[in-house]
C-alpha cells in the first residue's frame, strides 16, 4: 500500500503531467496567430476614471490631494479642460499608440464595464484572478501565503517551447507568493531582493545588483518601479523570454500615502515604461510584429475627496472596476471600445494563453473565455 506522502507525490505528478499534455495538445493552434510573445503589464490600483478622463481637478490641491508641488505647476503638467487631452497628458503611450493600433476597454461612461470577479478588490486577490482565471483564494487581503492555485504562467511554462521562457518582474515582494516560487519554477524578481544567479553577472547586472542593495526600498520591501524596469530590460536582452508578467506598484503606494501629485507622476512614468519596453521589443527581431501587450490594473479605488486613497469592497465602492489595453498583431485596431461590453479580470488568463495558441480552460475549467480582443482567424 502506498503511503500518504507517496500518493500525494504521484497525484502532484499526474496533475502536472495532465497540464503539460493539455498545453502541448493545443500548441499547433499557435500557427493561426502571429503572436509568439505575450507581456502582461499591471499598473497597480490605477482607476478607470484617470485612465479615460485624466487628472481629477478636485484633487489637484493640498487639501484633498495632498500635493507638495504648487497647484499651478501640477496643472501645467496634467490639466486640460478637454478630458481627451487630459488623458493623453497622463498616458501618452496608451492613448497615442495603444488606442490607435489596438484596443482600450473599460470606459464606464460608454457602458463598457470591466470588473473583478473576486469579492475583495485588493491586490493579492486581483493578481490571483488575472493569472489563474478565477477569484477563488483562501486569503481576502495580502497575507503572504503561497498561492495554491495554478497560474497561466506556470501552466505555459510546462509547454515544451516555452519552458524556461516565462518570467515575472515586479516591485511588490508578494509576487513570490502570488506566483508560488517554490512550486512554479518561474524566474521571479519581486520586491527589493534579487534572485540568486549561477552565472557571473554582466557589468550592467552587477550595477543593478549594487543599486538594489544600496537603494532604500518602499514600505514592506517593495522595489522602485525604475529599478524593476531596468532589470527587466537587461533580462530581455540576456534571456530572451517569451512570456512576461510585469507589475509596477508605485501608483498604489502613493495613493495610499494620500499624494495625488505622485499618483499622477508614477502613472505617467508607468506609461513611459510601457512605451520603452514596447519600442525595445519592436527593435529586436525575435519580438518585432509578433508580440502582444496586455496592460491593466489589479483593482480600482474609492471615489470622492477622501476615499480615492483606499480600495477594497464593500468598504470602498468602485474598487471592483478595472480597465484593459491590448496591442499586438492579433488585435484589431478598434481603439477605445464604445460598444456596451461587460468583461471580467478573470478573462485575462485565458487571453494570454489564447494569444499563444493554447486553451487554458482545458487545464482550469473555472476560467472564463478570453477577452473579445482577438481577430477572428
Where are these predicted regions, by residue range?
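Active-site-proximal N-terminal segment of extracellular/periplasmic enzymes that hydrolyze or transfer
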Residues: 29-103
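Metal-dependent active-site segment of extracytoplasmic phospho-/sulfohydrolases and closely related
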Residues: 39-40, 48, 269-310, 352
